[in-house]
């Protein structure tokens, strides 16, 4: 069994402090073993190692104003960048993201639908774009859902719930809605809707989450998110 030295985990410093105890847990060791075994066998995983903790690196703990939870990274080549629903510039925006843009256009008529899917601008404003599983095997959706990432992201959500206040949690689809149990609804705003995927029948359009999130932030003395990317 390998060991994980918490000091050597490359993640943004404020998150390292908050999640420090998680890095020595058995489940975290299991994650590292799984990724090392995949590499040894020539199995490709996404995102690249340097982007696994990109959501945390882009949005420090004390900067988080909103959280958008995804299931796991995109499993196609060049898509995953460590931010839920986001793809790098130059990669065609996936259908779920196009529906997110449609809802933004409905809520904010001045919103200009971009020709890219890079949501880094949201992350820099305090939107934690968190996938519940932080890695995936190429071409196999959900393949790393049971290797330990769930425990890690549960810990991150609980830390935000317990140590911060007035954060907007946007939970889309049944998988994300299950995370509500880790969030104190008296301290935070929990918004739920169907998943933005076209497979959900388009019912995501009209949820008004982006406007409601900003209304909540403004009501609690915070700068609203500029959703334009």
Curated annotation (Swiss-Prot):
It catalyses: Hydrolyzes single-stranded DNA or mismatched double-stranded DNA and polynucleotides, releasing free uracil. Keywords: Cytoplasm, DNA damage, DNA repair, Hydrolase. It comes from the Bacteria. One of its GO terms (molecular function) is uracil DNA N-glycosylase activity. The keyword Electron transport does not apply. SMART domains: UDG, UreE_C. SUPFAM superfamilies: Uracil-DNA glycosylase-like. Its EC number is 3.2.2.27. The keyword Hydrolase applies. The active site is at residue 72. It is found in: Cytoplasm. InterPro entries: UDG_fam1 (IPR002043), Ura-DNA_Glyclase_AS (IPR018085), Uracil-DNA_glycosylase-like (IPR005122), Uracil-DNA_glycosylase-like_sf (IPR036895). It is an enzyme of class 3 (hydrolase). GO terms for cellular component: cytoplasm. Its main location: cytoplasm. GO terms for biological process: base-excision repair, AP site formation via deaminated base removal. Excises uracil residues from the DNA which can arise as a result of misincorporation of dUMP residues by DNA polymerase or due to deamination of cytosine. Belongs to the uracil-DNA glycosylase (UDG) superfamily. UNG family. This is Uracil-DNA glycosylase. The lineage of its organism: Bacteria, Pseudomonadati, Pseudomonadota, Gammaproteobacteria, Cardiobacteriales.
